[in-house]
Each structure stands twice: as C-alpha cells, then as structure tokens.
C-alpha cells in the first residue's frame, strides 16, 4: 500500500515538473521573440509594426501563412538572415542564438496561428 502511494506521488510530481519545464520554455521563447523579433514582426506576429510594414513581413497569425511556413527554412533564415535580390538585408542574422532558442522561436511562430 505504501509503495503504491509512493509511486502515485512520484508520478504526480513528475507531471507537475514536466508542465513547469514546458511553461518555462514557452516563457523563454516569448522573451526571445520580444527581444529579437517583435520590432519587425510585432509581439502578436501580425507584422503591423513600422518596420514590419516597410519590409512587408508576413502575418504569422494568417492560416495561409502558417500552412506555407517551413520550419527548416525559418531556422535557416533565423541563423543566416535574409537578403533581397539586390543583396539588401531584409532580416539580420540571429546566429548568436542557440539551436534550442531557434527551435523554440520556430515553435513560437507556430503557436501564433489563429
């Protein structure tokens, strides 16, 4: 009986710990987004900032944009930046971010869909 209670308590504690870690990771991604991406893409991902409108950034809340969103291309763009056909920088490189931070940002963009 004591063993069964101990197992149940351990399982419940593990579930809460996992939920806490996931929540902390989501908070970290939001902070990384706010610090590095929101100036152009907006806190809400709609791209309706002065720079976002000037650069014509995509509305990440749009289902059509989400449907065409490619995680591998987004990862590459975050790491390497993006230039137009005239070699003008449209988005600077964020290669200083870790692979985990970039993966979390891509997941954050996915979470913006309406």
Where are these regions (language model features)?
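Bacterial N-terminal signal peptides that target proteins for export
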Residues: 2-12
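Sec-dependent N-terminal signal peptides
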Residues: 10-13, 17-20
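Electrostatic cytochrome c docking/interface patches
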Residues: 18-34, 48
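Stable alpha-helical elements in mature extracytoplasmic
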Residues: 29-33, 70, 74, 101-102
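The canonical Cys-X-X-Cys-His
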Residues: 34-43, 105
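Axial heme c-ligation environment in periplasmic c-type cytochrome domains
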Residues: 48-59, 63-64, 76-112
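N-terminal glycine-rich dinucleotide-binding loop that anchors FAD/FMN and/or NAD(P) in oxidoreductases
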Residues: 67
């Amino acid at each position: 009986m004591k063993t069964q209670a101990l197992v149940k308590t351990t399982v419940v504690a593990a579930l809460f710990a996992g939920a806490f870690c996931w929540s902390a990771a989501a908070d970290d991604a939001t902070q990384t987004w706010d610090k590095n991406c929101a100036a152009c893409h907006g806190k809400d991902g709609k791209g309706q900032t002065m720079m976002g409108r000037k650069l014509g950034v995509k509305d990440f809340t749009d289902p059509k944009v989400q449907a065409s969103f490619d995680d591998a291309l987004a990862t590459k763009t975050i790491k390497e930046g993006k230039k137009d056909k005239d070699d003008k920088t449209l988005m600077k490189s964020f290669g200083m971010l870790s692979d985990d931070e970039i993966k979390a940002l891509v997941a954050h963009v996915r979470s913006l869909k309406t």
